[in-house]
Amino acid sequence: MQRAGGGSAPGGNGGGGGGGPGTAFSIDSLIGPPPPRSGHLLYTGYPMFMPYRPLVLPQALAPAPLPAGLPPLAPLASFAGRLTNTFCAGLGQAVPSMVALTTALPSFAEPPDAFYGPQELAAAAAAAAATAARNNPEPGGRRPEGGLEADELLPAREKVAEPPPPPPPHFSETFPSLPAEGKVYSSDEEKLEASAGDPAGSEQEEEGSGGDSEDDGFLDSSAGGPGALLGPKPKLKGSLGTGAEEGAPVTAGVTAPGGKSRRRRTAFTSEQLLELEKEFHCKKYLSLTERSQIAHALKLSEVQVKIWFQNRRAKWKRIKAGNVSSRSGEPVRNPKIVVPIPVHVNRFAVRSQHQQMEQGARP
């Protein structure tokens, strides 16, 4: 027999291997009856790259290799010729060999497209699947084991219909790369979303940390020099807290817990700062009840009020010790007190409030 002959074995060889002696069995006997069903069930009977070998047992395939001088188009011509003259003589006797053939089919491992063209492959597979479904229930029952699902086989049919590249590399190039491209796109999308969402968070973090360091350096140089960091702990807190007092508001409404090395700043509003300054003019140290009253009135936590007063006292001591230009030894009533003003607040209105407060505070 010739394996290149396209889906047929000579009658004695193939039939003797599969069914009874003298049974002629070929693809033609399968194609003869009613036209094959097309549609989604085209390849359901067989595995992906195994379905279109000559339908005989592997023992019958062994003796005859491909003839050396045969051009590659000869199998197509012979197979097309064999498709035209169909005969149905040995169909009933060939059914037992059909069972053996469907069991033997998955053992073929070579891709079929070296032998047959895509249209012949599709026609042969359709005929074999339709005939096996009609005439023999056992191959139909065995079909899900050796075959792939219709959803997996439909892409294979589309890919087989593209002649230039052989299916196995082409299949592995296109279809596995489709989910990979989807993943790449989704990860890029996630990266874009993260980069679109991160600037807010990263800016806040950078603003929080960088703003602390910048404010600290600025305040230390402006109020007492870098020696303020070398002093005891209250002065360190004072340098940090005056950053919240003088610097730009970093994060609004975040409680600044005490005792943390790097904590979030509390951005006080100008009204809160004015009230705190008033209280500090009256009293440098607060009792617990006063602190709770002030915190409740200003809608702050007691910890925020306590830390603000600690920082304000440290700043006041720094100014008292280092600022020689303070008038009459009372730096508290100095009109050069710096109060942080948010950007959205009118600075002139706040300055006029400051002047009114200063005038009202003086006797």
UniProtKB/Swiss-Prot annotation:
CDD domains: homeodomain. Residues 1-22 have a biased composition (Gly residues). Residues 261-320 bind DNA. Keywords: DNA-binding, Homeobox, Nucleus, Transcription, Transcription regulation. PROSITE patterns: HOMEOBOX_1 (PS00027), HOMEOBOX_2 (PS50071). Gene3D superfamilies: Homeodomain-like (1.10.10.60). InterPro entries: GBX-1/2 (IPR042982), HD (IPR001356), HD_metazoa (IPR020479), Homeobox_CS (IPR017970), Homeodomain-like_sf (IPR009057). Pfam families: Homeodomain (PF00046). It is found in: Nucleus. GO terms for cellular component: chromatin; nucleus. Residues 128-139, 219-239 have a biased composition (Low complexity). Residues 1-31, 128-265 are annotated as: Disordered. Residues 203-218 have a biased composition (Acidic residues). One of its GO terms (molecular function) is RNA polymerase II transcription regulatory region sequence-specific DNA binding. One of its GO terms (biological process) is regulation of transcription by RNA polymerase II. This is Homeobox protein GBX-1. It comes from Homo sapiens. The gene is GBX1.
